[in-house]
């Protein structure tokens, strides 16, 4: 039997006094340690980015969850617009919970660490959430445009809104399938592929260079440029209708319309404690409806503007990269990296911005948020129910208050005119 060729003690050969040959250094492990220490470990400004991502993560999850709970627990908030707002919040929760952590790790390590399967799933879900957000905002604008500019052409209902939401998700899931089909995971350093996932990339793989140019040009037009243009025109007409002088929305027009009911009230000689005429009550209800519509339109315009600003950088950078082939041989790599990283963060910041907008521009959502936080944080005040009084009880309280103030016809006219001045912004 031949002696073993492996190093170590052999039978019958003394080992005392013999020195073992040193093992050869593992250059691959040393190289990986160098990459982690000097290249992959977050730098100072990247820690700021991590903190910003963490803040967006918690604000987006908590805020959008509260939006969904507020509408779910309060029947009076289940309007068509709020159904679409809940759908937008669900898309924001999806992209925040699944896509944000992956984007953060990719931006910091510049490596895809999640394998081949998630390389297809996560970008696909991100594209779906973008499509859902754009279509939802478009349906909100369309609903408001019909309700305010052409109320007799189309009547929006909760049932139609729910059907539209199902259609939005079905279309988004189907249209974004090509995004999942072209995503592939590969390693920049194939010799290290079996030892580490560092320097693996998840990127698009197309059969021809022409295909990505066509796809991303269409993606930019369909999911950003065209919808925003149409929504801008719709809200411009809504703005003119709600704030224009030609409609009965200004104080002078309201005063003129009120004169006739007040004169009739005096002629009929109604005494003390008389309620305002039905026409006067309807008139005041119209004024309040105008005020509510203005507030809602203002909030939705701000939501659309913030969405456009947050998605503009990444949309432009993707077109420059995929369509025009820029950034392949970038001389200033750090600047390009900073631009893409900041644009990625802006996309997720939009998900956190929406609940903040609702809080500042919607009194109903603000009340629900305050009630929820008062239950979680005792220092903010006593815990109150997330459900608010029904509109019927609130209306009866207001009716009693108005009745007590309408002692004579002149007094009722003064009260209503004062209400008109304060109701309209």
From Swiss-Prot:
Molecular-function GO terms, alphabetical? G protein-coupled receptor activity; orexin receptor activity
Q: Does the keyword Transmembrane helix apply?
A: yes
Q: Which residues lie on this side of the membrane: Extracellular?
A: 1-46, 106-119, 183-213, 322-336
Q: List the disulfide bonds.
A: 119-202
Its function? Answer: Moderately selective excitatory receptor for orexin-A and, with a lower affinity, for orexin-B neuropeptide. Triggers an increase in cytoplasmic Ca(2+) levels in response to orexin-A binding.
Q: Which PROSITE patterns match?
A: G_PROTEIN_RECEP_F1_1, G_PROTEIN_RECEP_F1_2
Q: Where is this region: Required for response to orexin-A?
A: 26-41
State the gene name recorded for this protein.
HCRTR1
On the Cytoplasmic side, which residues? 68-82, 141-160, 236-298, 361-425
| Organism of provenance | Bos taurus (Bovine)
The feature of type site (Important for responses to orexin) is located at: 36
Known glycosylation sites: 194
CC terms in the record's Gene Ontology section: plasma membrane
Instruction: Keyword check for Transmembrane helix, yes or no.
Output: yes
Q: What is this protein called?
A: Orexin/Hypocretin receptor type 1
**Which GO terms of type biological process are on file?**
cellular response to hormone stimulus; feeding behavior; neuropeptide signaling pathway; positive regulation of ERK1 and ERK2 cascade; regulation of cytosolic calcium ion concentration
Compartment list: Cell membrane
Q: Indicate the family of this protein.
A: Belongs to the G-protein coupled receptor 1 family.
Q: How does it sit in the membrane?
A: Multi-pass membrane protein
The annotated region (Disordered) lies at 1-25
Entry remark concerning the domains of this protein: The N-terminal region is required for orexin signaling.
Q: Which Pfam families match?
A: 7tm_1
The upper taxonomy is: Eukaryota, Metazoa, Chordata, Craniata, Vertebrata
InterPro entries, A to Z: GPCR_Rhodpsn, GPCR_Rhodpsn_7TM, Orexin_rcpt, OX1R
């Amino acid at each position: 039997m031949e002696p073993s060729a492996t190093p170590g003690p052999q039978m019958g050969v003394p080992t005392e006094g013999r020195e073992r040959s040193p093992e050869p250094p593992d250059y691959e492990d040393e190289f990986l340690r160098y990459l982690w220490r000097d290249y992959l470990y977050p730098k100072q400004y990247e820690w700021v980015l991590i903190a910003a991502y963490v803040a967006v993560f918690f604000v987006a999850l908590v805020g959008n969850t509260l939006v969904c709970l507020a509408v779910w627990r309060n029947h009076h908030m289940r309007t068509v617009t709020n159904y679409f707002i809940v759908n937008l919040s669900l898309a924001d929760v999806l992209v925040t919970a699944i896509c944000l952590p992956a984007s953060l790790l990719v931006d910091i390590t510049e490596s895809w660490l999640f394998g081949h399967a998630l390389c297809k799933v996560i970008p696909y879900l991100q594209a779906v959430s973008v499509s859902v957000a754009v279509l939802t905002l478009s349906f909100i604008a369309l609903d408001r445009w019909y309700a305010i500019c052409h109320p007799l052409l189309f009547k929006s209902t909760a049932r139609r809104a729910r059907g539209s939401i199902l259609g939005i998700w079905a279309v988004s899931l189907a249209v974004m399938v090509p995004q999942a089909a072209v995503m592939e995971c590969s390693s920049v350093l194939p010799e290290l592929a079996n030892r580490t996932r560092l320097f693996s990339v998840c990127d698009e793989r197309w059969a021809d260079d022409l295909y990505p140019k066509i796809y991303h040009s269409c993606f930019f037009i369909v999911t950003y440029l065209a919808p925003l243009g149409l929504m801008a025109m719709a809200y411009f007409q809504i703005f003119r209708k709600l704030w224009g002088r030609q409609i009965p929305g200004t104080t002078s027009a309201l005063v003129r319309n009120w004169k006739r009911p007040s004169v009739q009230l005096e002629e009929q000689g109604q005494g003390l404690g008389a309620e305002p005429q039905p026409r006067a009550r309807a008139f005041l209800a119209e004024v309040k409806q105008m005020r509510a519509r203005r507030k809602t339109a203002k909030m939705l315009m701000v939501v659309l503007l913030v969405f456009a600003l947050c998605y503009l950088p990444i949309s432009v950078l993707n077109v420059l990269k995929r369509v025009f082939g820029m950034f392949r041989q970038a001389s200033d790599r750090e600047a390009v990296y900073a631009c893409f990283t900041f644009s990625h963060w802006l996309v997720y910041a939009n998900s956190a911005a929406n609940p903040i907008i609702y809080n500042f521009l919607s009194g109903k959502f603000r009340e629900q948020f305050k009630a929820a936080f008062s239950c979680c944080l005792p220092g903010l005040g006593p815990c109150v129910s997330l459900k608010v009084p029904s509109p019927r009880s609130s209306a009866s309280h207001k009716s009693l208050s108005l009745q007590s103030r309408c002692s004579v016809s002149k007094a009722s006219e003064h009260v209503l005119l004062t209400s008109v001045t304060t109701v309209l912004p």
